[in-house]
Swiss-Prot record:
Binding, Mg(2+) 1: 580, 624
Gene this protein is translated from: Ac78C
Protein known as: Adenylyl cyclase 78C
Species the sequence originates in: Drosophila melanogaster (Fruit fly)
GO CC aspect terms: plasma membrane
Residue ranges with Low complexity bias: 153-168
Bias (Basic and acidic residues): 75-84
Extracellular side: 349-366, 419-422, 467-476, 1045-1048, 1116-1241, 1285-1301
Binding site for ATP: 580-585, 622-624, 672, 1440, 1517-1519, 1524-1528, 1564
Tissue expression per record: Expressed in labella, particularly in sugar-sensitive gustatory receptor neurons (GRNs).
Cofactor note: Binds 2 magnesium ions per subunit. Is also active with manganese (in vitro).
Length: 1718
C-alpha cells in the first residue's frame, strides 16, 4: 500500500471519474447518478451532501461496500470538549464515516415518522439527495473538510476501527485524491455559496444524534432503513458496466487537494463568507514536494524545498526567476547608489577636515578605481537582467554574479568611503539578506550563500582580533562582539531562510495552479484540435469553414425555431464519380469480418489517396460503392477547369488499384466507374450522424452511369466528354442499353479506351521527418563523371538515362501523346531555387497538376559536394533526393501537348545518372505507384490523439503507435513545459499586471475579484508569527550581550517576550483542543478575517519596534558607550603628574570611537612591544612634552584597509593644539577606549542592527498588504532616525570627534543601513504582493481552463458519438485499441432502408438551384432523427442518409441489449416499430405542408459485419448479404409498405406482427425471392383495409403528436456551435468570466427561400405556413413562456403571405417541368 500511495503521490491524474459519467438513456440516468453519488460520497467532504432521512418503520442494515470512506477509522469523542464546533473540527482530522452512519443521522425537526428532509419530501425511490436527482455536477456541493466533521464521532471506536481495517485495503482513500477546480469540489464559481435546503443540517442535532449513536442508544425514529429495490439494482449494475469511456491518463500532474470548503453550521461556501476561504493547511496539500511537513499548522522548513517531479521543478524555477527580474535590477541599483552615497560622504568629510597628503595619491586612486569597477559591474548586471533573452534563460547566473560582487566588496572593502573589513558588519547584514529577499535563486543556494558570507566574515574578525592581540587585553569584550555578530548573522539567515521558504512554498502551491492552468489550456487546445480533426474528417474544409463561419456569427442552433438550419451550398461545373466493386458479395462470403474490414479499409484508403492526389473529394461510402466529386477552391468556391480530367484519372487509378486486390485475394474483383459532369448541392442534412453529401439531378445521372457501366472501364457521359477537351480517346458506351434511367433521359455515354492512368502517380514518400533526416544524413559519394541524357523519355515512363533504362510501372504509351521533357536539370548547388525558376519559365504550374506533389522541398543544409540534381522520368513526374542531398520535385505538365526535354548537362562536380538512380530508391523521397511499394494502410482514428495535424501523411504512416504511447507522457510534460516557457514570460507578467492591477495600489481593477482575493484564507499566518517570535528572541539575545548590567532593559525585554509568547499562543490556539474556547475563537478569526489579521500583525511589529529601542532611553549611557565620567576618570589618573587642570571639555581627543570605522585604539610602546596602559608612560614631562612623547610613542599595529599612513591627528589640551603626523590606525578592530581599561564594551551600532531585525520581521508577514508594510517600514525608519539624531548626534552623550578625515559618523552610517533595508523590505513587500496576485489570476484561469477543457472534451465525445455509435465511440475513446481496426461480426441484426421515392419527382432546381426542395428533405430527416431520441428506439442506430433514403440498423450493441434485458429479435422488432413511427411522422408532415410524400421501407434481418474504415474520413458502416437484401427490399417495395424477406417475416410473426405474403419477385443479384408485407401488431388479415383505399401500414387512429425531445448526445449542429463557443472562450480575455453567451431566440422570416409548401397546384390559402402548429408545439420552454409568442406567430404568418403568393405564381410552370421530366 505504501508503494502504491507513493506512486499515487508522484502523479495525480487530472481527469477524475466523475467527468464522463452520463448515462445514455433515461433508464440509465439513475444508475449514472447513483454511481456519481457513490463516488462523491467516497470523500469525507460529501458527508453533509449524503444525509438521507428514513422512515421509522424500516430496519437497520449493514453498511454498504466500501462503507468506511477514506480508509480511516472513526474515533469516539474525547472527554471535556468545550464546544460542539470543536468536535466537528476535530473530526475533520480524524477521518471519514461510513455511508450507513451518515444514513443514521436524524436531522433536527424529524420527530414525526414522515420521510421529510427540511421540508422536502423524499421521492418514491427513496433518494432524498438532490445529487441523485440531477446530472449537474455544479449542483452537487462537495465539502472539502467540513463534511467530514462527523466522521470521527459517528460510531464506536472499536467497531469503526475494525470496519476501517476491513475496507482500507479494498477502498482507496478518496479524500486524498485532489479535487479539481470546477468539478463540484469547489463552489467558488457558482456565484452563490448556499447549499440546497436538503443539504443543510443543524450542527446541534447532528452532534446529539452522534452522541446517541456512540452511547449505544437508538436514534430518534429509530430504526434503520431498507434500501429501495431500485437503488439495490443500481448497485448491482454498478459493478457490471463501465460508465462512460475511459480517458487518457497521461496528462497527469502533481496537485494538492482543492482549498475550498463550506461552513459547518450555515452550509455556505467559505468563499462567499467574508473572511472565510480555503481549508487549513495539511500535509496532503504538500504531497507534491520532496519534504516539508505541517505540524499544528506550522510549516517545518526544509532545504529541499522542491517538487518531486524534475520537469515541474525546472518549470517552477524558470517561472519564479522571471518574476524576480526587476528585483535583481533593484538590488544592483541600490548597491550602486550606496557606493555613490559613501563616496559623497567621504568627499564631504575631506572638504571639512582638509586635503589629504600627497603620498596618499596612489592609495586613493586604487580606491576610486575599485569603486568605479564595482559600479560598472552593477550596471552591467542591470543591463543583462533587463535584456529579455538573457533574463528568460540565465537570470539566476546574473544573481550569482551579484552575490559574488557583494561579497568581494564586503571582504575587500577597497571602495571609496568603505570602512575596514571588521567594521563592515552592517554591509554584511545587507549581503546576507539580499539573496533571500530579492535575488532569483533557489532556497538551497541562498542558504549556502548566506552561510558562507556569515562564516567567512566571522572568521575574518576573529583572525584580525587574534593577530592584533585584542583578545589578550580584553577577551570578554572580543568574545561578546563575535558572539553578537554570530547572533545577528544567524538571525538574518534564519529569518531570510524561513521567509524565503514560506514565500517559495506559497508560490509553489500557486505555481501548481499556474501549471494546472497551462496544462488545462494545453489540454483544452488539444481537445479542440481533436474535435476539429473529427469535424474535418466528416466535412470538406470548404463546407466546414462555411458552417463554422455561419455558426460563429449566428445564434445557438439548440434553441427551437420553426425550421432547422440548412447547411447546403450550390456548386457548378463539377464532375461526379461513382465507383462500385463488382464481386464484393463473393469476397464478403469468403473472408472473416476482420479480414473484410481490413480489405475495405486498405482499398478505400487507397481510393482516398488516389482521389486526393487527383484533386477529388470523397463524398460517401455506400457499402462497396465509392463516390466522389472534383474539388473546388476553398476561398472562392470556384471549380477546377480540369475537373473532368481529374475524375477520369481517379477512375483509372481505381481500376488499377483493384487489380492488386484481385491478385492478393484471388477473387474476381473489378470496378465499375461512372462519371457525369454538372452542378450539385453539397452539404449536410439532419441533426444526427452528419455526413457530407451531394444532391442534384446530375448526381442521379452519375449514379446510373455507374449502374450502366462495364467492369474495368470508365463510363462517362457526353457532358463529361465535352469537358475533357479531347484528352482521352473514347468509344461509344451505349449506357442506355444497360440502364433504363439513362435511356429515358436519352443520355449519350462513352467509354474511355485507356485502362491505365494517363499520369502514373508518383509522389512524395510518407516517412516522418526524423526518418528522412536520418536517411539523408549520410554524405553522398563523390560525383562521377558527368553524364548527359542523350534521348528523351516518353510518357510511358520508359527511356534510357545514361545507359540506365528507366521503365514506368504501366509500360504503356499515351496513345501518341508524348510528354517529352526539355528542361535543363543541372543546377549549381549555390542556387537551388533556380530549379523552380526554370519550371516557371517553361509554364509548368505545380499547383495545376492533378497528381503532383504540393511543392518543392529544398534544404541547403543537405547540399553536398557543391552540386544539385533534379531528375524526372517520363510522365512519372516525381521528386527525389539526389546523391548531393538536395531534395527536388518534378512533375508532368498539365498541358498535354507541350513537349519538354530533359537533359542533364555536366557541371563542376555534377552527379552522374547512376548516382541519381541509386538515390531514387525505396528509402528516398520518391515513392512509385501503389503496386510497386509496400504501403501501410492508415488506421481510422489513429490520429485522434496525435499532437500534429492528422491529415498529414507523415503522421499516419510509418509511425510506431506503441512507441508513441510509451513516450506520450514525457512528450506531454515537455509540451506543457514548453507551453509554460512561451506563456510565462516576463512581458506576459507585465501585461497581466497592466491589465488587471492598479499600478500603485496593486489592487485588482475588478472589485469583485479584489473581494474574492481578500477572502482567501491565510494558512501561513501561524508560520509567519512563529518566525517573528524567533527573530524577537535573537534581538533579545543580541541586546543582552551588547548592553550588559541594565536591569530596566532586561525587565522590558522580558515583558515583551511574554507578550509575544501570548500572541503566538493565540495564533496557535486553533490547533490545540485543550485551550479555552475564547482563545480558539479569536484564533480562528485571525486566520479567516483579513482586517483582524492586519491589525494584529501591526500591533506585534510596533511592540517589537518600541521594545527594541527602549534600551536606548532607559539604560544609562555607560552601558553601551564611554561617557564624560569615564574620560574624567582617565584624566585624573594622569593629573598627579601634571599641573594641568583637566576637564572633559578641555581634553578632546581626536579619536572617534565608532564601532565600525575608527575607534578603540591600542597604545603600545617601542620598548615593551606590547599593549601598555597609557598611565605608565605619561609620568614625566610637562603637558606639551607629555602629549608629544606619549603620542609619538603610539603605534597602531593593525593593517588599514586602504594602505594610507601619516594621517594628521590633533590633540587639544588647555587651548594648545598638537599636530600628530606619524600615526596609523586600525582597519576594523573593536577595541577599548579609556573606559576599556575598566573592561567595558562600547558598541552602540548593535542597537541599530537589532532595529534592522525588526524591519526583517515585518518582511516575514507575507500576506500583509504591501502598502501597510511600506507605511509601517517608513514609520519605523523615521522613528529610528529620530533616535539616532537625538542620541548619536548629541554632544553631551557622545563627546567624541572623528578619528580621521576618511571616517564616517556613526549616525550617518546607521542611517544608510536603515535606508538600504527600508528599500529592500518595501520592494520585497511589493514583490510578494504582485506575485500573490498574479498567482491568484493564474489560479482563476486554471479553473476557467478546466471548465473549457471539460466543455471541449464533452464536445469531442459528443462529436465522435455523432460519427460512431456509442459502443464504437467508447471503443476508440478508451485509447486502448487505436492501433487496431474495429470490426465485429453480428449473428442477428436488423437493417432498414426507408426511402421517399416520389421526392425525386418533387425535386426541382428551378428555385434557388433546388435548395428549396432540399430544405424540405432536411426537415423530414430531422424529424426522423428526433424519433431516435425516444427510449423505445434505443437499440436503433442511424447509419447514414443517401439522398432521400434513410438507412438504420438495430441490435449492433449486444452489451446494451443485455443490460436492457432484450434479445436480438427484440431489436428487430424495435426497428419495425421505428419504421411505423417514420410513416406516422411523414403523414404528419404531409398534413402540415399539404404534400404527398410517400415512404417505402425495406427491412431484413440476419448476420452482418460492422466496422470503421477510412483513416482520413472514418465512417462506421455495415456490410453483408443482410444489408444488400434490405436495400433490395426497399428498391423493389411499394409505397407505404414495409417489405421483408421470408426469414424476417417468420421472426416477426413469432413476435405478434401480421405479415402478408406478397409472393415471389425478381431481385437483382438474388433471383426470385419470396417477400412479405409487415403490419402493426394486433391487426389481423381480415382487418386490413384495401391498399386501394388506404396505404397499408397506416394506423386507423392517429396518435398524438410526438413532441421533440432533448437529445442526450445533442444535435450535430449544436456540437459544432458549442465548439465555436469554446474557441471564443479560449480567445477571450483572461480573468474575465467566460461562458457561452445566452442564446437568442431566432425568429427567422421564411421569405422567398421558404420551401415548405408543396409545389403543386393545390391552394395554399387554407394554411400557408407549413407546420406552424407543430413547430409552435415543439418550441423550447423559453419560447413557451414568452408572453409575446402568439403575436409573433400571427405577425410571422401575415408577413409570409406575399412570399407564398409568389411561390403560387410559379407552381404551374414547375408542375409542367415535372411532367416533362416524367
Amino acid at each position: 500500500m505504501d508503494v502504491e500511495l507513493e506512486e499515487e503521490e508522484e502523479r495525480i491524474c487530472l481527469r477524475t471519474a466523475e467527468e464522463g459519467q452520463l448515462a445514455n438513456m433515461d433508464d440509465d440516468k439513475l444508475v449514472s447518478d447513483e454511481v456519481h453519488l457513490r463516488q462523491l460520497s467516497a470523500t469525507p467532504s460529501s458527508a453533509f451532501s449524503l444525509q438521507h432521512s428514513r422512515g421509522s418503520d424500516t430496519k437497520e442494515e449493514a453498511p454498504p461496500e466500501g462503507g468506511t470512506m477514506g480508509g480511516k477509522s472513526a474515533a469516539p469523542r474525547e472527554e471535556g470538549e468545550p464546544d460542539e464546533r470543536v468536535v466537528l473540527r476535530r473530526a475533520v482530522d480524524k477521518g471519514a464515516i461510513a455511508l450507513a452512519q451518515i444514513d443514521d443521522l436524524k436531522l433536527e425537526g424529524d420527530d414525526d415518522d414522515e420521510a421529510v428532509v427540511n421540508g422536502e419530501e423524499v421521492d418514491g425511490l427513496g433518494l432524498s439527495n438532490p445529487a441523485a436527482q440531477t446530472t449537474d455536477d455544479e449542483q452537487i456541493t462537495v465539502n472539502g473538510t467540513g463534511a467530514a466533521a462527523t466522521s470521527s464521532v459517528a460510531a464506536d471506536a472499536a467497531s469503526s476501527e475494525q470496519d476501517a481495517a476491513s475496507t482500507a485495503m479494498a477502498t482507496p482513500d478518496m479524500s486524498k485524491i485532489p479535487r479539481l477546480p470546477g468539478d463540484g469540489a469547489q463552489m467558488e464559481d457558482n456565484g452563490s455559496g448556499d447549499l440546497p435546503p436538503s443539504l443543510r443540517a443543524s450542527t446541534t442535532s447532528i452532534l446529539s444524534n452522534l452522541r446517541k449513536k456512540q452511547q449505544g442508544g437508538p436514534l430518534r425514529g429509530g430504526v434503520a432503513k431498507q434500501t429501495p429495490l431500485r437503488v439495490q439494482s443500481v448497485r448491482i449494475v454498478e459493478a457490471k458496466r463501465a460508465y462512460g469511456p475511459k480517458r487518457r491518463t497521461e496528462s497527469c500532474s502533481i496537485f494538492g487537494n482543492s482549498n475550498f470548503e463550506h461552513d459547518l453550521e450555515s452550509g455556505n461556501s467559505l468563499a462567499s463568507i467574508p473572511g472565510q476561504s480555503q481549508r487549513p493547511l495539511n500535509n496532503e496539500m504538500y504531497s507534491a514536494f520532496k519534504s516539508g511537513n505541517v505540524v499544528k499548522g506550522i510549516l517545518c522548513p526544509s532545504l529541499t524545498n522542491s517538487f518531486k517531479q524534475s520537469s515541474l521543478e525546472r518549470s517552477y524555477l524558470t517561472y519564479t526567476h522571471r518574476q524576480r527580474q526587476k528585483s535583481l535590477i533593484i538590488v544592483n541599483v541600490v548597491d550602486f547608489v550606496l557606493k555613490i552615497v559613501l563616496a559623497f560622504v567621504w568627499i564631504m568629510r575631506r572638504s571639512e577636515l582638509g586635503p589629504i597628503e600627497s603620498d596618499d595619491g596612489t592609495s586613493m586612486a586604487t580606491a576610486i578605481t575599485w569603486s568605479v569597477c564595482c559600479g560598472i559591474a552593477n550596471m552591467a548586471i542591470c543591463f543583462l537582467g533587463y535584456w529579455r533573452c538573457f533574463a528568460n534563460n540565465y537570470l539566476h547566473w546574473a544573481a550569482v554574479c551579484t552575490w559574488v560582487l557583494f561579497n568581494i566588496q564586503g571582504f575587500v572593502g577597497q571602495g571609496v568611503g568603505f570602512a575596514d573589513r571588521e567594521y563592515l558588519v552592517w554591509y554584511i547584514l545587507f549581503v546576507i539578506f539580499v539573496p533571500y529577499a530579492m535575488l532569483p535563486l533557489p532556497l538551497k543556494w541562498c542558504v549556502v550563500g548566506g552561510t558562507i558570507t556569515a562564516s567567512c566574515h566571522l572568521a575574518v574578525i576573529t583572525i584580525i582580533k587574534l593577530q592584533h592581540g585584542e583578545a589578550t587585553i580584553n577577551p570578554e569584550c572580543v568574545l561578546f562582539q563575535i558572539f553578537a555578530n554570530f547572533i545577528l548573522y544567524t538571525a538574518i539567515n534564519v529569518a531570510g531562510m524561513y521567509t524565503k521558504y514560506l514565500t517559495d512554498r506559497g508560490q509553489r502551491l500557486a505555481f501548481i495552479e499556474t501549471h494546472k492552468a497551462m496544462e488545462h489550456k494545453k489540454e483544452s487546445e488539444k481537445e479542440l484540435q481533436r474535435t476539429q480533426k473529427l469535424l474535418d474528417s466528416i466535412l470538406p474544409n470548404i463546407v466546414n469553414n462555411q458552417i463554422r463561419s455561419e455558426m460563429y456569427k449566428g445564434t445557438d442552433p439548440t434553441v427551437e425555431t420553426q425550421f432547422n438550419k440548412l447547411y447546403v451550398y450550390p456548386m457548378d461545373n463539377v464532375s461526379i464519380l461513382f465507383a462500385d466493386i463488382k464481386g464484393f458479395t463473393e469476397l464478403a462470403s469468403k473472408t472473416s469480418a476482420q479480414q473484410l474490414v481490413k480489405i475495405l479499409n486498405d482499398l478505400f484508403a487507397r481510393f482516398d489517396r488516389i482521389a486526393e492526389d487527383n484533386h477529388c473529394l470523397r463524398v460517401k461510402l455506400l457499402g462497396d460503392c465509392y463516390y466522389c466529386v472534383s474539388q473546388f477552391e476553398s476561398d472562392n468556391w470556384k471549380t477546377r477547369p480540369d475537373h473532368a480530367v481529374c475524375s477520369v484519372e481517379t477512375g483509372l487509378h481505381m481500376i488499377k488499384a483493384i487489380k492488386d486486390v484481385r491478385l492478393h485475394t484471388h477473387v474476381d474483383l473489378n470496378m465499375r466507374i461512372g462519371i457525369h459532369s454538372g452542378s450539385v448541392m453539397c452539404g449536410v442534412l439532419g441533426n444526427k450522424k452528419w455526413h457530407f453529401d451531394v444532391w442534384s439531378n446530375d448526381v442521379i445521372i452519375a449514379n446510373h452511369m455507374e449502374s450502366g457501366g462495364i467492369p474495368g472501364r470508365v463510363h462517362i457521359s457526353e457532358a463529361t466528354l465535352k469537358c475533357l477537351n479531347d484528352a482521352y480517346e473514347v468509344e461509344p458506351g451505349n449506357g442506355g442499353c444497360r440502364d433504363n434511367h439513362l435511356k429515358m433521359l436519352n443520355v449519350k455515354t462513352y467509354l474511355i479506351k485507356r485502362t491505365e492512368p494517363l499520369r502514373p502517380k508518383r509522389r512524395f514518400g510518407t516517412r516522418s521527418s526524423a526518418h528522412l533526416a536520418g536517411s539523408v544524413a549520410t554524405a553522398a559519394p563523390p560525383c562521377a563523371t558527368p553524364t548527359a541524357l542523350p534521348k528523351s523519355i516518353s510518357a510511358s515512363g520508359s527511356g534510357s538515362i545514361g545507359g540506365v533504362t528507366a521503365t514506368g510501372n504501366d509500360g504503356a504509351s499515351i496513345d501518341g501523346r508524348s510528354l517529352e521533357y526539355a528542361a535543363t536539370i543541372a543546377v549549381p548547388a549555390q542556387q537551388p531555387t533556380q530549379l523552380l525558376q526554370q519550371q516557371q519559365k517553361k509554364n509548368i504550374s505545380l499547383n495545376s497538376l492533378p497528381n503532383v506533389v504540393e511543392g518543392v522541398a529544398m534544404d541547403s543544409r543537405r547540399i553536398r559536394n557543391g552540386c544539385g540534381v533534379m531528375g524526372g522520368a517520363g510522365g512519372t513526374g516525381g521528386g527525389g533526393t539526389g546523391p548531393c542531398g538536395m531534395s527536388t520535385v518534378s512533375s508532368p505538365t498539365a498541358m498535354m501537348s507541350a513537349p519538354l526535354e530533359v537533359q542533364l548537362r555536366p557541371r563542376n562536380g555534377a552527379c552522374s545518372i547512376q548516382n541519381l538512380a541509386e538515390a531514387i530508391d525505396g528509402k528516398g523521397l520518391i515513392i512509385e505507384d501503389e503496386s510497386t511499394t509496400d504501403w501501410i494502410p492508415e488506421i481510422p482514428f489513429k490520429n485522434l490523439n496525435s499532437p500534429e495535424d492528422g491529415l498529414n501523411r507523415a503522421d499516419s504512416i510509418l509511425v510506431d503507435t506503441k512507441e508513441d504511447h510509451r513516450v506520450s507522457v514525457a512528450v506531454l510534460d515537455e509540451e506543457i513545459d514548453e507551453f509554460i516557457e512561451q506563456n510565462i514570460q516576463i512581458n506576459s507578467n507585465k501585461e497581466i499586471r497592466r491589465e488587471y492591477l492598479n499600478p500603485w495600489t496593486l489592487k485588482f481593477k475588478d472589485k469583485s475579484q479584489e473581494q474574492k482575493f481578500c477572502q482567501l484564507r491565510e494558512d501561513m499566518f501561524r508560520s509567519n508569527m512563529l518566525c517573528v517570535f524567533v527573530i524577537w528572541i535573537f534581538m533579545v539575545l543580541c541586546q543582552v550581550i551588547i548592553i550588559p548590567r541594565c536591569t530596566r532593559l532586561i525587565i522590558c525585554l522580558s515583558v515583551g517576550t511574554v507578550i509575544l509568547t501570548f500572541c503566538c499562543v493565540l495564533v496557535m490556539a486553533e490547533e490545540f483542543p485543550g485551550l479555552p474556547r475564547c482563545l480558539k475563537t479569536n484564533s480562528a478569526k485571525l486566520v479567516h478575517q483579513r482586517q483582524r489579521r492586519t491589525l494584529f500583525i501591526c500591533g506585534v511589529i510596533v511592540s517589537m519596534c518600541m521594545l527594541s529601542a527602549i534600551g536606548l532611553v532607559l539604560c544609562p549611557s555607560s552601558t553601551y558607550i564611554g561617557t564624560a565620567d569615564e574620560h574624567s576618570r582617565f584624566l585624573r589618573m594622569v593629573s598627579p603628574y601634571s599641573n594641568i587642570s583637566m576637564t572633559e571639555k578641555e581634553f578632546k581627543l581626536n579619536v572617534y570611537l565608532s564601532a565600525t570605522i575608527h575607534h578603540n585604539i591600542t597604545i603600545s610602546t617601542p620598548a615593551s612591544g606590547g599593549p601598555t596602559p597609557l598611565v605608565d608612560i605619561t609620568s614625566s614631562g610637562p603637558s606639551d612634552e607629555f602629549v608629544r612623547s606619549t603620542l609619538n610613542a603610539l603605534t597602531l599595529n593593525l593593517t588599514p584597509p586602504l594602505p594610507q599612513s601619516h594621517r594628521p591627528y590633533t590633540l587639544t589640551t588647555n587651548g594648545h593644539s598638537v599636530s600628530l603626523s606619524n600615526l596609523s590606525y586600525s582597519d576594523a578592530s573593536v577595541m577599548q577606549s579609556s573606559s576599556d581599561v575598566e573592561g567595558q564594551c562600547a558598541h552602540p551600532e548593535y542597537l541599530v542592527f537589532t532595529w534592522v531585525l525588526c524591519l526583517v520581521s515585518l518582511a516575514t508577514a507575507l500576506k500583509l498588504y504591501y502598502l501597510v508594510k511600506a507605511l509601517m517600514a517608513l514609520a519605523m525608519v523615521a522613528f529610528y532616525t529620530t533616535l539616532i539624531m537625538m542620541k548619536f548626534g548629541s554632544g553631551d552623550s557622545f563627546s567624541l570627534v572623528e578619528l580621521s578625515r576618511l571616517g564616517m559618523p556613526l549616525g550617518v552610517q546607521m542611517l544608510i543601513l536603515l535606508i538600504s533595508f527600508l528599500v529592500m523590505v518595501c520592494y520585497h513587500a511589493r514583490l510578494v504582493e504582485v506575485t500573490s496576485r498574479l498567482d491568484f489570476i493564474w489560479k482563476e484561469q486554471a479553473e476557467r481552463e478546466l471548465t473549457n477543457m471539460k466543455s471541449n472534451r464533452a464536445l469531442n465525445d459528443t462529436l465522435i458519438k455523432n460519427i460512431l455509435p456509442d459502443h464504437v465511440a467508447t471503443y476508440y475513446l478508451s485509447d486502448e485499441h487505436t492501433d487496431e481496426l474495429y470490426s465485429k461480426m453480428h449473428n442477428l441484426c436488423g437493417v432498414m432502408f426507408a426511402s421517399i421515392p416520389n421526392f425525386q419527382d418533387f425535386y426541382s432546381e428551378d428555385i434557388d438551384n433546388g435548395k428549396a426542395c432540399i430544405r424540405i428533405l432536411n426537415e423530414i430527416i430531422c424529424d426522423f432523427d428526433e424519433l431516435l431520441e425516444e427510449p423505445r428506439f434505443a437499440s436503433v442506430e442511424k447509419i447514414k442518409t443517401v439522398g432521400a433514403t434513410y438507412m438504420a440498423a438495430a441490435g449492433l450493441n449486444h452489451e446494451h441489449l443485455r443490460l436492457r434485458g432484450e434479445t436480438s429479435e427484440d431489436s428487430v422488432c424495435d426497428l419495425v416499430e421505428f419504421a411505423f413511427a417514420m410513416k406516422q411522422k411523414l403523414e404528419e408532415i404531409n398534413g402540415d405542408a399539404f404534400n404527398n410524400f410517400q415512404l417505402r421501407v425495406g427491412i431484413c434481418s440476419g448476420p452482418l459485419v460492422s466496422g470503421v474504415i477510412g483513416a482520413r474520413k472514418p465512417v462506421y458502416d455495415i456490410w453483408g448479404n443482410t444489408v444488400n437484401v434490405a436495400s433490395r427490399m426497399d428498391s423493389t417495395g411499394e409505397n407505404w409498405r414495409v417489405q421483408v424477406p421470408e426469414n424476417t417475416a417468420e421472426l416477426l410473426c413469432s413476435r405478434g406482427y401480421t405479415c402478408v405474403k406478397r409472393g415471389e419477385i425478381a431481385v437483382k443479384g438474388k433471383g426470385m425471392m419470396t417477400t412479405f408485407y409487415v403490419h402493426p401488431k394486433g391487426i389481423s388479415e381480415s382487418q386490413l383495409i384495401s391498399p386501394v383505399r388506404m396505404p397499408a401500414g397506416i394506423p386507423l387512429a392517429q396518435t398524438p403528436n410526438l413532441q421533440r425531445q432533448t437529445s442526450h448526445h445533442g444535435s450535430f449542429s449544436a456540437v459544432v456551435f458549442g465548439m465555436l463557443q469554446a474557441s471564443k472562450r479560449s480567445t477571450a480575455i483572461a480573468g474575465t468570466p467566460t461562458g457561452t453567451p445566452s442564446p437568442q431566440i431566432r425568429r427567422g422570416h421564411r421569405g422567398s427561400t421558404f420551401s415548405s409548401v408543396r409545389l403543386s397546384q393545390k391552394s395554399t390559402t387554407v394554411n400557408p405556413v407549413r407546420r406552424n402548429t407543430t413547430r409552435v408545439r415543439g418550441r423550447s420552454y423559453r419560447q413557451k413562456k414568452s408572453s409575446s409568442n402568439n403575436s409573433i406567430v400571427t405577425q410571422a404568418s401575415s408577413s409570409y403571405m406575399p412570399s407564398f403568393r409568389r411561390i403560387d405564381q410559379i407552381e404551374t410552370t414547375i408542375s409542367k417541368s415535372h411532367n416533362d421530366a416524367l
